[in-house]
Amino acid sequence: MRFMLMAAMASLVFTACTTTRETRLYDALGGAPGVAKLVDAISAEYRDDARIGFLFEDTDQDYFKARLREQICAISDGGCEYTGLSMEEAHSGMDLSEAQFNDFVDASRRAMTKAGFAIGVQNRLLARLAPMRGEVIHQ
Amino acid sequence: MLRQPSPLIALLLLPIAPLHAADEGRLKATGGLVTIEAAAGGGLVPWAVMAGSSTRPGVDVVAGFSATQVADFRLASLGLSASWNDRFELSLGRQQFTVDRGLLPAGIDRRIGQTVLGAKLRIAGDLIYGDLPQMAIGLQYKHSDSDVLAGALGARRNDDVEAYFSVTRLFLAGPFDRNWLLNGSVRATRANETGLLGFGRIGDDDHALVGEFSAAMFFNPEFAIGAEYRQKPDGLPGLGESDWRDVFVAWVPNRRFSLAVAWVDLGTIAARPDQDGVFVSMTGNW
């Protein structure tokens, strides 16, 4: 009985892993239309956020969204080339704190939830954005 | 009457927490819960995280209450924990262990209290970011009120200091594309039943190195399921002290409040076997 249970759990883990690993993140996000929807949601959420919205007062929204679409496409294996500033350059002079970075994470999660992205896809995208933290904060 | 803190104190304190909402800080759930020994962690096991959600610079104070009911015993614990700059944590815990009616002759106090004063220092790494997992060292000074009972059972003393080292990491998008928290701690201890039955024993006064482990999977940012295992020393002769384990569900609706419900298996306590039951824990922060 215990063996059966373990076998069932193992096969569950195996299937879950293979199904998710087979899906390119870019496709899981819904390809170009999905990424566009995601970026619209994220930029709106950032702009309206009480704590980080002020950082976007002078931002050219169209330019910002175009670069963010490229970047998300690039890091999700969608094959795009990111043509914007480096992360250090883009956040230079802002001196973002760790708390503000966390506000961005929270806002991104809210935006993705509102836009209907599943938790697993949210986690995968955030896992790929997380390594950039060092290039974003305290610049 | 500080010797026997009432659960009511915690219940009175906790609802205040959301009014003093910390509006910014770390991501929620990254402060863990207040453990039975007041340090931030899971239910039974301290983690390398700092209580609450302070970042640099910042101070955060957390209050927690837990209640454990197994076959023949109850354990209530109340903890206060403060952290500075996501670096250093001080905690104060008060536990009350109660033996169920009928197990002891009339006239003997069925309650044992213990005070735990803790300090924890984050020494390296980060819970989520960078190459290294978060690491911390901690000390816990424990004072058990059970000098007579513990002495009669063979314990050498009723207060002692324990040291531990914890490594904790949140893995983003692990199996099932879920975020997983893993913790491993090593503790040097001479405690009998975490100190409730004193420390050391006649004929063996060495510290034991014990391992304590937690694993949790976040279904989503609000709900996690997990398990813990806490190794314990051999204990007093004839009492059959066991390792402790639990399986829990945690609800973290925001940065200020969390609730965990667990099934705990405390094995044999004071020669009474099959001590499994329910554990409930609440943590709120300012």
What spans do the regions from the language model cover?
Chain B
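C-terminal appended segment following the main domain
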Residues: 245-286
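Detector for outer-membrane/organellar transmembrane beta-barrel domains
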Residues: 155-235, 243-244
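Cleavable N-terminal export/targeting peptides
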Residues: 1-33
